[in-house]
């Protein structure tokens, strides 16, 4: 695909007329920046079994999306493209790297720290699931990773463990000269030839209400704290502001609309694959790179997010004028597929010859999905270091579903009906069955008739 070339040309074209401007005057950008981003990867080191449809003909294809080695290869390809174009780049993680698979249960964040450190990330914001254990485990994770961890509306000074970490910051400054990049601690560290960009971390202000391991950490209002941080950065001479958030797409828009000075919000938490993926039967969850008017109604903030489970990567080009105002913000999410395709959910009937060629041709002509190889070194590291314990923990397969039982967190996603997940009701029914067993009912003295389960706690299809 020629996505990289078309993305750059379109971005420059928009920058020349100005973003949200009524003027036809040519505005020469002071700086362009490319951002690759992921979020809510949830320990999906291996690919996720999935499916998509081939446009109007509705032919269903069973495949795999993502996994850390495929995600790394995609990120490296984006970095190589930016370097070839002499374009500065940041690679950002929107939080919730923890939980999701048995890899996390077996390693409690240690494997996540190891593998994320191989990714070449520039920064990560804390998600709510990073607080699922205790702050001791989180402190170990933060001290181990090779990139800064961010949260500006959080005070860890009274926590026994997090108060001592030296890799947790409210924001991180980056100095760019052409495509060359370095992290700096103060604006004064930048030379006259370098452009300074701030990445501010924003976490949930109500974190203790949904996370169990917050310790003695306190959290403050997302909007108030972030505006104060922006104002402080502005007084120091920083006028190019990126927010790396884990508060959800709706809250990202609210943050953009109630502050001034944010150029782009790179989000997470709501698992929102922004963009129109209806031709792939993956739903339409809103505009990628949507422009939200800021509180002053003069400038706009661009909002992006890249789905879930390391299945996709976001790639966006932004440009700024000399005052740090956003001129353009153009890009999209791309689903990362393997190159083995099947006719059935059990992966027993592989597509060969012309069938596979048809799928490959469809993908090559669709900028929302791509076939991507895995990074060999990272795959080897996972298979040698972490997979043996995972396979031993899972044991033998004891049953199989004759047909795929679908799961989506939100009704209407990926072709589901108004009721959404088919897996979640089965789990709720299983809870009723368990509660009404004689051994349990004898203790509770209850006859349970209703089972409730949050669909967000269900993570995958059954196939």
Regions found by a protein language model. Give the residues of each.
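Acidic, metal/ion-coordinating pockets
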Residues: 23-338, 451
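C-terminal motif of bacterial Sec signal peptides marking the signal peptidase cleavage site
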Residues: 15-18
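Bacterial N-terminal signal peptides that target proteins for export
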Residues: 1-7
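Solvent-exposed loop/linker segments at secondary-structure transitions
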Residues: 34-35, 39-49, 83-90, 98-105, ...
């Amino acid at each position: 695909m020629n996505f990289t070339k078309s993305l750059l040309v379109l971005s420059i074209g928009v920058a020349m007329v100005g973003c949200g401007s009524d003027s036809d005057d040519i505005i020469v950008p002071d700086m362009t920046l490319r951002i690759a981003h992921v979020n809510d990867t949830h320990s999906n080191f291996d690919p996720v079994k999935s499916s998509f449809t081939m446009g109007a003909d509705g032919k269903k294809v069973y495949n795999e999306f993502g996994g850390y080695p495929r995600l790394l290869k995609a990120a490296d390809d984006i970095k190589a493209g930016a370097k070839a174009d002499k374009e500065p780049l940041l690679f950002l993680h929107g939080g919730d790297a923890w939980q999701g698979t048995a890899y996390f249960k077996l390693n409690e964040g240690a494997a996540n720290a190891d593998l994320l450190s191989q990714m070449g990330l520039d920064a990560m914001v804390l998600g709510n699931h990073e607080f699922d254990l205790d702050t001791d485990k989180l402190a170990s994770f933060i001290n181990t990773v090779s990139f800064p961890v961010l949260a500006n509306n959080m005070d860890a000074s009274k926590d026994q463990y997090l108060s001592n970490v030296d890799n947790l910051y409210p924001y991180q400054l980056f100095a760019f000269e052409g495509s060359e990049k370095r992290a700096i601690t103060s604006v004064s560290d930048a030379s006259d030839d370098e452009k300074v960009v701030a990445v501010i971390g924003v976490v949930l202000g109500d974190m203790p209400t949904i996370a169990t391991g917050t310790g003695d950490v306190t959290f403050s209002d997302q909007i108030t704290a972030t505006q104060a941080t922006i104002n402080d950065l502005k007084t120091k001479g920083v006028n190019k502001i990126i927010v790396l958030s884990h508060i959800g797409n709706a809250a990202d828009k609210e943050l953009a609309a109630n502050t001034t000075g944010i150029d782009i919000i790179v989000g997470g938490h709501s698992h929102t694959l922004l963009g129109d993926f209806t031709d792939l039967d993956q739903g339409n969850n809103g505009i990628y790179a949507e422009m939200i008017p800021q509180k002053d109604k003069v400038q706009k903030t661009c909002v992006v997010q890249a789905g879930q489970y390391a299945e996709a990567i976001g790639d966006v080009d932004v440009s700024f004028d000399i005052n740090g105002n956003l001129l353009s913000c153009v890009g999209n999410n791309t689903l990362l597929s393997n190159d083995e395709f099947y006719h059935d959910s059990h992966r027993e009937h592989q597509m060969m010859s012309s069938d596979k060629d048809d799928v490959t041709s469809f993908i090559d002509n669709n900028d929302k999905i791509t076939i991507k190889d895995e990074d060999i070194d990272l795959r080897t590291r996972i298979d040698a270091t972490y997979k043996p314990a995972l396979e031993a923990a899972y044991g033998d397969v004891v049953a199989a579903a004759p047909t795929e039982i679908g799961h989506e967190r939100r009704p209407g996603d990926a072709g589901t009906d108004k009721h959404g997940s088919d897996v979640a009701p089965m789990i709720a029914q299983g809870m009723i069955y368990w509660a009404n067993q004689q051994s349990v009912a004898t203790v509770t003295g209850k006859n349970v008739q209703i089972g409730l389960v949050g669909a967000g706690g269900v993570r995958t299809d059954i196939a």
